[in-house]
A protein has these predicted regions:
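ABC ATPase nucleotide-binding domain
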Residues: 5, 25, 61, 521-523
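The feature captures the beta-strand-to-loop junction immediately N-terminal to the Walker
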Residues: 35-37
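ABC ATPase nucleotide-binding domains
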Residues: 100-104, 108, 223-356
Length: 548
């Protein structure tokens, strides 16, 4: 499967930059989720890769093919990019059966394809089934109802799935009536001998024309596959439909109409239709958002399995961070048209690049705590939190905060210089939706809008990020508080603890019940507390937090 590369891709609507200077590499066979709030540019990015939206500038490469290049004037149409697109709405034809919906795109394909002896290939499929006649008989006998009548449709579906046959070959196999024969083995051997003769005859005919039939019954000439511009045959279309129906488990619904299916079944049909032409890349734009919570969870599991079985590259758009965390091999988090972080899900969760990423990923949300202080000689940080509580932050890895700020400031200056250079170029349009500092939320007992003056921040201002699972309630803890709310959900309970005017959210495991108003002492466990710069919102390091 191909690698996808985006280089300096920008999409602008007048002064609004939907996507700004995006650089991204999606490795082959990856499952990448484009994550972000509504209107951040994730769907625009997906549509540009698929060819449904034309970028303002930049370059997009799929595999070895450049599909868009603003400088070279290249823009390959969507139907030539060999990609599949799965939409939020299933977009199934209501007047067509499931089979007709899946096969619809296949019937319109006309392009140079390998020349195949379809009859010989079908005969080879039957020959494979006849090598195990007792198994065929067993499958058919399982399809008799209580009245002793054979359910031919059920028998055909089972034969199709067992031997990967088309419906035409399965019908022929059922027509041999091995299940009614006194000696199924002898009858199968007789039929197999006849099929072998026909296959050998097809090979001889190919040789007479100066060609050969390979193992897949594709015509070759001097080892090269012979191609011809043609449409897919009925046999090829049916095999493709049956192949994808096996993957998404909808073989029994082929004769039904969309209105007769549940939401989950309709989504499976839409997935099968997208997979049928064997796209090199599969794009999905919030495909599960119309399903209820239980079905959404089930379909997430199916999509994981689908990715493994097809070996395709998946690019998936969602605003649901739970979907992104559970499905993706890498998360591409976008906000206001800018790439915020591109990493493995656990790296995004544990080591967010900035305050926005930390806030967006995680449920319940991360606890932010304002802190002020400085680094000590031993490398730890002596900080004040919660209006006077003294804490000590011990980094996991050695870090010099002055050196960190010097590197960070140099990066910011380089970015500013690049923007100034771009602004001086002819045709540059100033960005209307400029990047703004993220306003993180400090949870308090009495919430109110703060209209006071902006605080002048220094390099001694920090923000601590503590995930709810690292908040613990213990009698031995030094930070005193009381239970503000308690929400048990079985084996875990989400608790909010008031520490003075501030609120901390924790997740307690083991089915413990807490009573609102009870005293509760809080401590910070583990070494995954995150230290951010309050001045520039960037991630500094991970460490442990000790209350003094």
């Amino acid at each position: 499967m191909p690698k996808i590369v985006l280089e300096h891709v920008t999409k602008r609507y007048d002064r609004f930059y939907a996507v700004d200077d995006l650089n991204l590499v999606i490795e082959d066979n990856a499952f990448v989720t484009l994550l972000g709030p509504s209107g951040c540019g994730k769907t625009t990015t997906l549509r540009m890769i698929a060819g449904l939206e034309t970028p303002t500038s930049g370059k997009i490469t799929i595999g070895d093919n450049v599909v868009f290049d603003s400088e070279e004037g290249i823009n390959v149409p969507a139907n030539k990019r060999k990609v599949g697109f799965l939409f939020q709405n299933y977009a199934l034809w209501p007047n067509m059966t499931v089979y007709e919906n899946i096969s619809f795109g296949l019937t319109n394909i006309k392009e140079p394809l390998p020349k195949i002896n379809v009859d010989a290939r079908a005969e080879a499929g039957l020959l494979k089934a006849l090598k195990a006649p007792n198994e065929v008989v067993k499958i058919v006998n399982e399809c008799y109802d209580k009245k002793g009548k054979l359910d031919e449709n059920k028998a055909m579906i089972k034969l199709i799935d067992a031997y990967e046959l088309s419906q035409y070959s399965a019908k022929k196999l059922l027509g041999y009536k091995l299940h009614q024969s006194k000696d199924a083995k002898a009858e199968a051997e007789k039929l197999a001998a006849e099929l072998e003769k026909q296959i050998e005859s097809a090979r001889n005919d190919a040789k007479a024309k100066g060609m050969e039939l390979n193992e897949d019954f594709v015509y070759t000439n001097n080892g090269e596959v012979v191609k011809e511009e043609r449409k897919l045959t009925k046999e090829e279309i049916d095999l493709a439909v049956r192949r994808v129906s096996r993957i998404v488990k909808i073989g029994m619904f082929m004769d039904r109409y969309p209105a007769e299916l549940s939401g989950g079944q309709q989504q499976r049909v839409a997935i099968a239709r997208t997979l049928a032409p064997e796209p090199t890349v599969l794009f999905m734009d919030e495909p599960l958002s119309n399903l209820d919570a239980k079905l959404r969870l089930e379909m997430r599991s199916e999509l994981q399995r689908l990715h493994l079985e097809t070996g395709s590259t998946f690019v998936y758009v969602t605003h649901d961070q739970m979907e992104a965390m559970t499905l993706a091999t890498r998360i591409c988090l976008i906000d206001n048209g800018d790439l915020q972080q591109y990493d493995a899900p656990l790296d995004v969760y544990n080591m967010p690049d900035n305050l926005f990423v930390a806030d967006f990923v995680g449920n319940p949300a991360i606890n932010f705590i304002d802190a002020k202080g400085s680094q000590e000689k031993d490398g730890s940080f002596s900080l004040d939190i919660f209006d006077g509580h003294k804490v000590r932050f011990v980094p996991n890895d050695k870090i010099d905060i002055n050196e960190w700020y010097a590197n960070s400031n140099a990066q910011d200056q380089k970015k500013a210089d690049e923007l100034a250079l771009k602004a001086s170029e002819k045709g540059y349009v100033e960005r209307g939706n400029k990047e703004k500092a993220f306003k993180y939320h400090i949870a308090k007992v009495d919430e109110f809008e703060d209209y006071g003056d902006e605080v002048e921040l220094t390099e001694n201002d920090f923000v601590l990020g503590v995930r709810p699972e690292f908040i613990n309630i213990s009698d031995k803890a030094k930070l005193k508080g009381e239970i503000y709310s308690s929400m048990p959900t079985g084996m875990e309970t989400t608790v909010r603890v008031a520490v003075g005017p501030y609120l901390l959210t924790g997740v307690m495991f083991g089915g413990v019940v807490y009573k609102i108003g009870d005293k509760a002492n809080v401590e910070f466990t583990g070494n995954n507390v995150i230290l951010f710069s309050r001045k520039n919102s960037k991630f500094i390091t991970l460490g442990k937090l000790e209350v003094e």
